[in-house]
């Protein structure tokens, strides 16, 4: 537990303390990523609800971080609320869900989401029951580099993304001997391809700052050409799709699209909970998210390599 947490969280906490030592205003945000199929699988194995699983691990992780000496218990900076603070939140937070749904509807209204039929793997049991398999529960051979442990829609080895039918020799990770097949299912896709030019310019402006592996993965993705990415999935455990139509009743907002917004939602939730004495009150989060005259604003992210695409391509891309 401690080694796993240390690699991700200690560098961020060190940076937070360094920025404070320099006299700067700083807000540190993170939290527990609590949606997706791995949670439901654990719940089924333990015979408990998904909410019980995430409640247990959020408590364990939050305590472990504080025990490591991280500053998550210091919600308000000791210099005053105007200097910031920290919040370790969670994606099952009701406000996180509400803000994510607000953003989802804004993108829909701006015509940045499109309905599209996609092919998705599903597992068929002996009685003919169908269970759709999330991408990370399908493994096979990458059609680009030949990696034999590629996931259903992405290869972590070369960074390639592809459609379900393009993966070679697919099998269910949880049940390798099960019969699997591809079936059509309708989902909403984020028009990421419309931001190709903007993201290429953004990438060029960051070349002297990003690490070599980030630059390489970015170049690879952009050279392949960005494609629309699904923002909904056939999952029960997740944030409901906020569309009043029975077509979307059994679908949830895709976790990669939802969780990456946690940095933004966490800042807003921090302001709503702790910034009552700040001059801007619940809008205090804007000081860390909106560039203003005579203000130098900077974001620093600490993450695993598998999160690079989400942070690079989905975080900077919305118009508003």
For each predicted feature, which ranges?
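N-terminal, positively charged nucleic-acid-binding surface of large information/translation enzymes
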Residues: 3-202, 206
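Structured secondary-structure scaffolds
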Residues: 3-30, 98, 145, 154, ...
């Amino acid at each position: 537990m401690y080694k796993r947490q240390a690699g991700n969280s200690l560098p961020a906490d060190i940076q937070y303390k360094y920025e404070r030592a320099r006299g700067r205003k700083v807000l540190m945000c993170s939290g527990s990523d609590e949606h997706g199929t791995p949670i439901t699988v654990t719940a089924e194995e333990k015979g408990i609800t998904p909410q019980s699983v995430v409640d247990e691990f959020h408590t364990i992780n939050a305590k472990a971080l504080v025990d490591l000496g991280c500053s998550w218990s210091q919600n308000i900076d000791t210099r005053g609320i105007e200097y910031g603070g920290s919040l370790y939140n969670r994606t099952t937070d009701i406000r996180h869900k509400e803000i994510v749904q607000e953003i989802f509807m804004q993108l829909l209204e701006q015509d940045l989401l499109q309905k599209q039929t996609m092919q998705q793997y599903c597992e068929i049991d002996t009685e003919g029951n169908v269970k759709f398999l999330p991408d990370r529960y399908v493994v096979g051979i990458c059609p680009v580099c030949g990696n034999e442990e590629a996931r259903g829609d992405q290869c972590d080895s070369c960074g390639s993304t592809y459609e379900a039918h393009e993966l070679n020799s697919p099998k269910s990770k949880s049940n390798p001997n099960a019969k699997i097949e591809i079936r059509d299912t309708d989902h909403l896709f984020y028009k990421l391809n419309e931001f190709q030019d903007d993201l290429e310019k953004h990438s060029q402006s960051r070349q002297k700052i990003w690490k070599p592996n980030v630059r390489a993965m970015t170049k690879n993705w952009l050279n392949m050409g960005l494609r629309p990415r699904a923002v909904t999935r056939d999952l029960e455990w997740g944030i409901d799709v906020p569309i009043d139509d029975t077509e979307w009743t059994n679908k949830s907002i895709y976790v990669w699209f939802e969780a990456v917004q946690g940095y933004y939602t966490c800042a807003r939730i921090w302001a709503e909970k702790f910034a009552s004495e700040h001059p801007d009150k619940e809008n205090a989060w804007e000081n860390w998210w909106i560039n203003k005259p005579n203000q130098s604003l900077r974001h620093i992210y600490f993450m695993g390599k598998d999160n690079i695409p989400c942070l690079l391509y989905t975080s900077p891309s919305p118009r508003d």
